[in-house]
Amino acid sequence: MSSFLEISRLYKTFPTPKGPLTVVKDFDLRIRKGEFIALIGHSGCGKSTVLSMVAGLTDISEGGIVLAGKEVTAAGPDRGVVFQAPCLLPWFTAFENVMLGVDQVYYTASRLERRQIAEYYLSLVGLADAMHKRPGELSQGMRQRCGIARAFALSPKMLLLDEPFGMLDNLTKMELQDVLLDLWQRDQKTALMVTHDVDEALYLADRIVMMTDGPEATVGDILEVKFPRPRNRRELLENPEYYRLREYLIHFLNERSHHRPAPREAAPPAAQPPASGFKRLINTFASS
């Protein structure tokens, strides 16, 4: 099976006063290009540790991660990361925060082209009228919109999201879920998202990877989510299959998360839209 991201027998062990603690053990996952994968499990099970290793922000104890044929050994612009807190520089405007990364990635583009890229993604996330405000002048939801725009503007090969909406109220969370889906469907980036929200996982993902409880957490089960795209929240909530899958996830989290069954095979890749015009500039850097 052709994989865009391949995680093989991944281990993460931390030293403690009582001896080594293995947080993640024998974690295997294959993700195809264009898939949106949700990684779900109880708090503290190691979800964010796995994502951090994929991002190159945490060292791997054993095993390996290969992205687009290259081994992951450190952080890099081929992976755009959105954290729970957007980590914006407070003395820069939203536009300037996005431009920091754009200037590094599109270094051969003209200044005008780089500005257009930053403005394009800030407009897509709804910050056209607020892009020249500093983070202290923005709401938490607006700051997270900026974080999402910054990640997409880098034109990464893969998008990594670590509970990006966990600090938001429900209404803002739903709005930003739709913003994320619109951007993802527009750019068709491969995405791996950590969440503890069952409904969020069902709404966003093509497959949901369920992790067992830690320590020594691993893949417990994988659920395929076959709802057609683009997805409509109201239609999903009226679909009996949505509640069947929801119950399956809740049952795993409540009853089966201590077990370690073998994962299922990955779903087929999502279709890739043709690039044209402005997209060609972005895709040129994404493939380099």
Indicate where each model-derived feature is located.
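Short coil-to-helix segment of the ABC ATPase nucleotide-binding domain corresponding to the Q-loop/switch region
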Residues: F92-G101
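Hydrophobic anchor residue at the start of the ABC signature
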Residues: I148
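The feature captures the beta-strand-to-loop junction immediately N-terminal to the Walker
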Residues: I40-H42
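Conserved signature/switch motifs of ABC ATPase nucleotide-binding domains
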Residues: K133-G136, L154
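Helix-to-loop junction immediately C-terminal to a conserved catalytic motif
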Residues: A55
